[in-house]
């Protein structure tokens, strides 16, 4: 299945973009959007901003997200994904990156509309505290499914993606875990694999996997990465 030939819009994104197209007030949707549309598309932002510039990263995430997702949890959760990617590219260790990710939560969520959503940072902190007790992928996957949740809410899916990424530390392993987990598997997998890929690099993914994705979706991953790398040198707010 070609990913570009199916509807990739979630409920919040669809509602706000339709309002845009009709010239209506789209903020009545963005101020209430608790879903994961911002987080699922944010990884490239983590490629553009240095890992140690939290304010710039959070502000960039907010500006990119607010057209469809303007809440504290959506922006904060997306910033955590972007920060994990930025930290991976920046050569931080997994342990250092976890601290970076937790730190940016408060910086970023202050830029969104306040909501009643659960703290993604505290849910991620919980995952970090228990993952060392697991030595079986299926059991950890079940813990994520039962405790963090794998639904479309940012508080569930971003927490799940971060947990999977920091547990697996491998894009291929994370992809397999997410595909078998249940729930919003493609979104969680996209975020988790982007994070792992930032640490591992493209060559860590078996050629059979990457070539299948490129052929099926008519993509050239190396060319896309080169474009992002060039944009990194010229990007500014």
Give the role of each language-model region.
Residues 1-237:
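Structured, active/binding-site neighborhoods that engage oxygen-rich ligands
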